[in-house]
Amino acid sequence: MVFAWFVWLAFTQWTPPGTLLRKANLWCIIGIPGIWWIDLQVDGVRRGSLGKSPGSHMPEPGSIVAASHTSPIDILYLATILDPIFTQSYPGTKLVKPLTLLSALASCFSLPTPPKDRSGLLPLSKLVSQHPGRIIATFPEATPSNGRSILTLTPSLLSASPKTKIYPVSLRYTPADIVTPIPGLYSAISFFWTLLSTQTHCIRTRIGAHMRVPAADAAAMNPMPTHQRASSFESNYFDTLSDEEEAKKRVQKDEDGITETERRVLDMFADTLARLGRVKRVSLGIREKAKFVEAWTKGTKGRRA
């Protein structure tokens, strides 16, 4: 495995994307630790008939992959089969930061914080237009979870163009002991020890049908009323007030700077990821995880003392 990584760092990473040499090198990196058997299913396609089904069911150049995130293996696996451009999402902003393979792997063992200098951040729509021949991979949760739930999504997917296809992808592992929900050096050591001490791991991959982010004006025109409109005779000043309050709620922004309508769009993606992974959604995001990690770290230091 060390030799395979040496070949990648010294030579293969500089070769053009999608070449046979890159794929072979990445398959060696992912296969040597025992990650061989991959269970792949695609929405709307019967098992074993993916190549025979018409239409595009797999991510293609110019599209975006929105994947669940639990382990560094997510990144290695996606790099092996899709060779995408990885991105880092952040709370409170729709912009993302392009990452190299090594930077994406390193991000699994730390909590992302938006950089003070935002010159390196850009929307997904611009990244797709700059690289029309590549697939863009994003982890909208922004940080690995424990594999038992989908965290609250960051707003990064909202920066995609309404014309761009977004493929939800769920990645799970059996046994589920190579997840890295807690950042830090100890988590990295524990991950590598578990990975190398187990003979084999299975990747369960579920790819959903492509979705799109609705245009802002189209989303705003779907108010989804919560009350029945009275007759024109019964309509009065209070009906007008109620409509105005609903309109204000739809444009009012939360702590992440997104509106209620945009939150519904993110909920749609989160529901799909939860369905594909057969897990639950939780109302915890990266901010809550940061508080938990801080408390957990203090508790661990206290027990050691």
State the predicted function of each range:
Residues 1, 44-58, 284-305:
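Eukaryotic N-terminal targeting leaders
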Residues 1-39, 292-305:
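N-terminal membrane-anchoring alpha-helices
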Residues 15-27, 36-39, 54-118:
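Catalytic core of membrane glycerolipid acyltransferases/transacylases, capturing the structured
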Residues 27-29, 38-56, 126-128, 194-195:
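Beta-strand elements of modular eukaryotic interaction domains
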Residues 61-67, 132-140, 164:
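Generic beta-sheet signal
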Residues 114-129:
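A Trp-anchored, charged/polar loop motif used as the substrate-binding/catalytic surface
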Residues 134-135, 142-256:
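A cross-family acyltransferase "interaction/gating" segment
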Residues 231-276, 283-286, 290:
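Cytosolic terminal low-complexity segments enriched in Ser/Thr and acidic residues
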